[in-house]
Amino acid sequence: MIKNLARTFGALSLALVPLLSSPAAHAAAPAAPVAEVTTLADAVGLVKVTEEDRTGYTRTKFKHWNSGDDKSDGCNTRNEVLLAEAVVAPTVEAGCKLTGGTWVSYYDGQEVTSAGSLDIDHMVPLAEAWDSGASAWSAARREVYANDQGADVSLVAVTARSNRQKSDQDPADWMPPSPEAQCRYVGEWVSTKLRWGLTADDRELEALKVYAEGPCEDTIVRYTPVV
C-alpha cells in the first residue's frame, strides 16, 4: 500500500512539473511602443545634440522605393503615399499606374492634378538622417526608414520644385515658403527625429528653438518611437 501511494504521489509530482513550469516557457511579449504627445518646446528638448558627419553617404544606402506596406496591391511606396494623400482619388490602372486625382502640396500651397508632378519627400532627408545617426544602422533599418508609412509625417507628397529647393537642408537653412506651413513642418520634422532617435547639430537645434519658443509655441508633436 505504501509503495502504491509513493508511486501515485511520484506520478502526480511529475505531472505538475510542466504545469508549474509553463508560465516561464511563455514569457510576456515586449510591450509595443507607446505614442507620445508633447508640446513642440518639450519635444525639441528631447532631441539629442551631436556633430553631423556625412562621411560615406550615398542615396543607395537607403533602398527605396520598395513594394510598400501592402504587398498585394502592386503599388510601391511612392504610389501608396500618393493614394493616401490624394484629396481626390486617382484612378488606379494596371501596374498601379495612377491617372487623374488631385493633391495639395502643403510646403507651397499648390494644388496638383498630375501624380508625375509630385515628389515624395522624406521629412528628414536621407542625407540628414545619415548625418544624424542612420550611418550606424543596418541596411534593413535604413530601408524601413526610407519607406516608412508607419507615421503620416514621415513621407509627404509635395511639388517637385519645393522638394528640390529643400534638398537635404535642415530647418536652419530651409523652411517651406508658405508661412502657414511652417509650424506644421517644424512639428513634423521634430516628430520624425524623435520617432527614429535621430540627433541634431547646434545650428539645427537653435533654429528649432526659435520656432518652438515663438510662432509655433502652440504646436503639438505626436510620435511613436521605432524600436
Label the predicted regions.
Residues 103-227:
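Domain-level detector of nuclease and nuclease-like folds
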